[in-house]
Amino acid sequence: MTQITFKNNPIHLAGSEVSEGQHAPDFKVLDNDLNEVSLENYKGQKKLISVVPSIDTGVCDQQTRKFNEEAAQEDGVVLTISADLPFAQKRWCASNGLDNVITLSDHKDLSFGQQYGVVMEELRLLARSVFVLDSNDKVVYKELVSEGTDFPNFDAALEAYRNI
């Protein structure tokens, strides 16, 4: 079982670990209007999946903004996934004036977290991570941030996304 830290406390991750080079597993999450969404909804597009513990924290807020600002010029889609309720995600987008940010909730059954191995067992939140998938859903980049309150490597993730 993979272990990270969150605020310097050890945290165990549950689920199946995903590796670069493998086909990305499907998942079911909810959009801001409670519609079920899966990987199939973004078929044929390259994807940058930004995973955050909670959209309402400073680091998660900055991570979401940075990836959406930097990747906006690229073809493809940026998805931000957290275990927040869809209502909280929708409120965050509205209160920050961000209409084009795609936030998806894994709150219902942690399907994404289990399929990608990023469920923090002790907190029932998702571990900060980034996955870049090509248009055929092959994982071309993965980063699992070892300390949950740190930022991911924005440059490496964006380079992988741009180079698809």
UniProtKB/Swiss-Prot annotation:
The Thioredoxin domain, residue ranges: 18-163
Coiled coil: none
The reaction(s) this protein catalyses: a hydroperoxide + [thioredoxin]-dithiol = an alcohol + [thioredoxin]-disulfide + H2O
GO MF terms, alphabetically ordered: thioredoxin peroxidase activity
EC number: 1.11.1.24
Annotated PROSITE patterns: THIOREDOXIN_2, TPX
Disulfide bonds: 60-93
Uppermost EC category: oxidoreductase
CDD domains xref list: PRX_Atyp2cys (cd03014)
TM region(s), chain numbering: none
UniProt keyword list: Antioxidant, Disulfide bond, Oxidoreductase, Peroxidase, Redox-active center
Active site, renumbered: 60 (cysteine sulfenic acid (-soh) intermediate)
Lineage: superkingdom: Bacteria
HAMAP family with a match to the protein in the record: Tpx
Function noted in UniProt: Thiol-specific peroxidase that catalyzes the reduction of hydrogen peroxide and organic hydroperoxides to water and alcohols, respectively. Plays a role in cell protection against oxidative stress by detoxifying peroxides.
Other noteworthy facts: The active site is a conserved redox-active cysteine residue, the peroxidatic cysteine (C(P)), which makes the nucleophilic attack on the peroxide substrate. The peroxide oxidizes the C(P)-SH to cysteine sulfenic acid (C(P)-SOH), which then reacts with another cysteine residue, the resolving cysteine (C(R)), to form a disulfide bridge. The disulfide is subsequently reduced by an appropriate electron donor to complete the catalytic cycle. In this atypical 2-Cys peroxiredoxin, C(R) is present in the same subunit to form an intramolecular disulfide.
Entry-linked NCBIfam families: PRK00522.1
Similarity comment: Belongs to the peroxiredoxin family. Tpx subfamily.
Name used for this protein in its record: Thiol peroxidase
Organism, scientific name: Staphylococcus haemolyticus (strain JCSC1435)
Annotated gene: tpx
